[in-house]
UniProtKB/Swiss-Prot annotation:
This is TBC1 domain family member whacked. Essential for ensuring the polarized growth of tracheal seamless tubes. During seamless tube morphogenesis, likely to act as a GTPase-activating protein (GAP) for Rab35 to regulate vesicle trafficking from the recycling endosomes to the lumenal apical membrane to ensure the polarized dynein motor complex-dependent growth of seamless tubes along the proximodistal axis in tracheal terminal cells. The keyword Membrane applies. Keywords: Cell membrane, Cell projection, Cytoplasmic vesicle, GTPase activation, Membrane. Gene3D superfamilies: putative rabgap domain of human tbc1 domain family member 14 like domains (1.10.8.270), Ypt/Rab-GAP domain of gyp1p, domain 1 (1.10.10.750), Ypt/Rab-GAP domain of gyp1p, domain 3 (1.10.472.80). It is found in: Apical cell membrane; Cytoplasmic vesicle; Cell projection, Filopodium. The lineage of its organism: Eukaryota, Metazoa, Ecdysozoa, Arthropoda, Hexapoda. Changing M133K: Seamless tube overgrowth at terminal cell tip branches. One of its GO terms (biological process) is retrograde transport, endosome to Golgi. PROSITE patterns: TBC_RABGAP (PS50086). Disruption phenotype: RNAi-mediated knockdown in the trachea results in a U-turn phenotype in which the seamless tubes undergo a series of 180 degree turns in terminal tip cells.
Amino acid sequence: MATAPRSLDTISLCSTVSSCPDRNGFYGGFQRTDKPKEPLSKAQIIAREKKWLYMIDNWSIYMSKNYKKIRDRCRKGIPKSVRPKAWFYLSGAYLLKKKNPNVYNELLEKPGNPTTIEEIKKDKHRQFPFHEMFLDEQKVGQIELFNVLKAYSIYNPKVGFCQAQAPIAAFLLMHLPAEDAFWVFVSVCDVYLQDYFIPGLEVIQNDAGILEGLLKKTCPPVYRHLQKHKVEPLLYMTDWFLCAMTRTLPWETLLRVWDCFLAEGIRVIFKVALVIIGASLSRHKVRKTCTGLCETLAVLRSPEEHIVEEEFIINNMMRLNLRVEDFQIEHTRQKARRAKQKAQQEAESSGSGNGHRRNMPTL
């Protein structure tokens, strides 16, 4: 990740950087791709676009009476030309914008918290530094990213600004006008990733326990390996979940995952995580070479290229034998476990005689 603003001249010194952007606007970095995308026929593309446009024109009917059709079409992949509008509707951002006319521009007129503003200024250049929108401070990407993050910090002062939000906002700005991106961002932060960015990160810790429980169900050998070497979920999944995979997956895979994520919610991120973990450590030969915590983390943090390919992730995500009830059961179990831990900590603190209450561990 970059630590200072870079121009194209600066980053061109790196051997992984091209003088021409790829079809998605990347000059370099792991999300650049020079592989040709398998083309659909023009007739197929037009047919899909028409289906989506009709569905969006009748959105409330589909959401109330035929949501399964929306979900299935998202899993198949949203046509590129329709994706911005589809995400705007899938996330519910179109309703937020309708209920809050002119709010985004009004937020931009406000000064904001000085400390938060400085944090945003320091962080904005670090997002997708190899993408044409974010190459330097004068590019529209960095300007709009600052505006969206500043506006949100004022809109939801309870959360303010968290560094993990920045790649999500930048990712959305690559697809949507700034005001629309802001409202999708609000929906993602306040609904899809609700309470993820509150200081203490208690929700992400709870979800780490849920992920561990689901891994035990879906891939017992891998679960046992992680337990044996004391590989805690927070050591490898925090960035995946907090950034909603935006800093983890190749570009085409990320787009497909977000098509599903905005239709089905956080369960999609759980499933993608389970696919990566399971596929990375499913072979006995690989587990045998992972003789400790560090070796195992290295495998999980740098999955093989084929594991994060678009079709592999999507197909294996759909094959996971997980019901909504499985997530609910694990959520209830983790909630009870954390309540018990909290009670024990309070009891220990009370018994120590100094009245000190231990805080939940933070990241």
